[in-house]
Structures are given as C-alpha cells and as structure tokens.
Regions:
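Alpha-helical transmembrane segments and their immediate juxtamembrane cytosolic regions
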Residues: 1-394
Length: 394
C-alpha cells in the first residue's frame, strides 16, 4: 500500500478489522444463550441490532483489502492471480467445513452413550458427514472473496457499480416474487437451499439458512461495494502529502457512508432490512455505517494519532481469519471438554459461567463477562503472534 508520493498505509483498516473479529467472537460466545443483553442479540427477523453489524463490517473491509491485494497484479487476470484466488477460496471454504465437523466430533464424543465400545464411539464421532452443515460464515467469506476477485480482474472497474446495482435489484425482484420476506419454508431462499443442500446440511432456523445459496448473491455485491470504496479511497486520491490524503479520505468515506445509509433506510419501507436473507437494504445500510465508522477511526487513529488504545484490536486485525478460526475452535473445546464436579461433570464453559462468573455478576451480566473473558483469552494468543510479528495468512 505504498505510493511514490505519499504513504497510503492506513492503521484504521487493521483496527476496524480487529474490532469486527473481536465483535464476532463476543456475540458468538455468551455465557448463556438464554441471558443476553438486547444489543448483543441478532434481530429476530426484520430490523437491525449492533450485533448484526459485525459480520457485514468485516465483509466490507474484505472488499477494501481485496482491492489492495489485487492491485499488485495490475488487476489483470493471469495464472498466478487465478491460482491464488482459487487456492484461497478453497482453503477458506474447507476450513469452515472443518470447524463444523470438529464441533460435531467433539460434542458427540462428549455425549456419546456409555454402552458404545471405543471403536463405535470413535466411528460415530468421526462419521458425521451425513449431517454436517455445508455453508456458514467462513464458506460465505470464501465464496464472496472468490467471486468478487474474479469480477475485479475480468471487468472494467467503472462498470462494477452497475453490476452491484443489478445484483441488488435482481435479488430484490427475486425476493418479491418468491415470498422472500417470509420467515418460513415457503421462502424462495429456503426452497432452493432445501432442494440443493437438503435440510440435513442446513442451519435450522424456520427453514432459513442465513448463509444460504441465494443470499450469497447480495453478499457478493456487499464485498464489491467495499472494493469500490477501496478504489475510491486509494486511487481516486491524488494528494501530495499524507495529511491531505487522510483528510480527503475522511470526506470520501463519510459522504459514501451517509449516502448508502440514507438510501438503505429510505428504501427499507419497501424492502425491509434483514440480515438472515441479506436483503439489499441490509447491504446498503451496513456498508454505509461501515464506511462512516472507518472514517471516524481514520480521524482518531491516523489523523489525530490516538493509537495506544488500538493495540488491543490490532492484535486481532493483523491475523483476522486465524483469530476467528481460533475463537471457533476454543469455543468448541470449552463447551465439550468436561471434568468431574460434585456428583457429575461440568464443561470448562459451564464452570467459568455457572461457578465463577454468574454468582458474582448475575445471569445476564455474567453471560457478558464470560464473553469478555473469552475474548481476553483469544487476545492473549493473538498478542503473542502480533508481538513476534507472526502473520498467519489464510
């Protein structure tokens, strides 16, 4: 990210990436799913909560990062670029499936009937492919990265905004014609997912898989929007000094954020904001808010120089996908590894929440305290990598 005229390195990008990863880990790991503060819950169906922002914020930043990473290929599709995209897409997708398999293995092993032999227990724990979820967060990241990267290398960049508009408009028409705003199995998204993926390989939520096949279409547009903002930030800015460069970025990001957010909320009267179907208005509003938040971070960190507080999130941001995977693996281990306690046994998760935190903070505050403690444990590992300048690229 260097220019012969001015350094275009933006620390705020790493910090926002780290904030979103820490946020994703936090909302996925409460002490008790039955005791969560309202802002830390996903919207039941239509609507938006702070929790609904963390994943789309990361995808927006992925779009900007994709622009930066593909720039070294001069945005020309060649063998090296194609193989890099293909390899990374496959690796991220398979890691997502591996996490799903690992979760089933650990939890079945921990709860298997006592009358099974070791071999039967091992086989039953290992062979869960007949009911493993095919899609998920990592899989969506993989598909969106792969599709957006290929588009960026094969299409004139000035035409990408029209493609984004076409994808979102076409998806809205699909939702309108296919009962796409219904929270049940008559929804076209559910119909397609159940026909292709089959229910055994889907997330169970009234027949709706929040990372399903058709809703990947607007998610690709989401990453492309981030790509376009990255292009506007880094190549649309010809400032001769860093201060002017950063100030110009602030204005650009803020204006883009206001326009997208206002447009999304305005259109939400006809197209509800909905994360589970990744509605077009959800794309506009979350990209707009991400752009505005990035502008705020650039002003605080890169312009004003208030950086000391940001080191915590930078430890997450420099190894984002690794830290997310680490959080998923630790969550599975905390929930499935048990030890004797009294007349029965208790998991690490259960011990920390029920025995250590809940008696001190209460049910809901204790649930939040567990999530924060879990983030701190992940950070300790991430910080060791950050301190040693170890960057694990996935």
């Amino acid at each position: 990210m260097n220019s012969t005229k001015v350094s275009k390195r933006i620390l705020a990008l790493d910090i926002l990436r780290g904030v979103t990863i820490a946020g994703m880990i936090m909302v996925n790991n409460p002490g008790s799913w039955g005791h969560i503060y309202a802002p830390l819950r996903h919207a039941e169906w239509n609507g938006l909560t702070p929790t609904d922002l963390v994943f789309p914020f990361f995808m927006f930043i992925m779009g900007i990062s994709t622009y930066i990473s593909l720039k070294k290929y001069n945005f020309e599709f060649n063998h090296a670029a194609g193989m890099k995209i293909l390899k990374r897409t496959i690796v991220i997708f398979l890691i997502g499936m591996a996490i799903g398999w690992f979760s089933r293995f650990c939890y079945y092993w921990a709860s298997a009937p006592d009358d099974l032999s070791f071999g039967e227990k091992l086989w039953a724990s290992v062979w869960t492919f007949d009911r493993i979820r095919i899609l998920g967060v990592m899989q969506r990241l993989a598909l969106c990265y792969g599709a957006a990267s290929i588009i960026a290398l094969t299409m004139k960049h000035k035409h990408i905004p029209y493609l984004i508009a076409g994808l979102l408009t076409g998806y809205f028409i699909l939702l309108m014609c296919g009962n796409g705003f219904a929270y049940n199995e008559t929804n076209i998204l559910s119909v397609v997912d159940r026909a292709i993926l089959t229910p055994a390989h889907m997330y169970k939520d009234n027949g709706i898989d929040p990372e399903g096949l058709l809703s990947t279409i607007p998610a690709i547009a989401h990453v492309l929007l981030g790509f376009c903002v990255g292009r506007l930030m880094l190549d649309g800015n010809k400032s001769e000094d860093r201060a002017s460069f950063l100030n110009s970025q602030l204005i650009t990001l803020f204006l883009v954020g206001v326009i997208l957010t206002f447009s999304g909320f305005l259109l939400s009267y006809g197209c509800p904001i909905n994360k589970k179907i990744w509605s077009p208005t959800y794309v506009l509003v979350t990209c707009g808010l991400a752009s505005s938040f990035l502008a705020l971070l650039i002003w605080i960190i890169d312009v004003k120089g208030y950086k000391k507080w940001s080191m915590f999130f930078e430890a997450f941001g420099v190894n984002p996908l690794f830290m997310y995977v680490l959080g998923g693996v630790l969550s599975i281990l905390f929930g499935s590894i048990s030890f004797p306690w009294g007349d029965s046994s208790i998991s690490i998760h259960g011990f920390l929440y029920n025995i250590v935190l809940m008696p001190v903070f209460g049910e809901t505050a204790g649930s939040l305290a567990f999530a924060l403690l879990f983030i701190a444990i992940n950070w300790c590992i991430g910080y060791q990598l950050y301190k040693r300048k170890i960057y694990i690229k996935i």
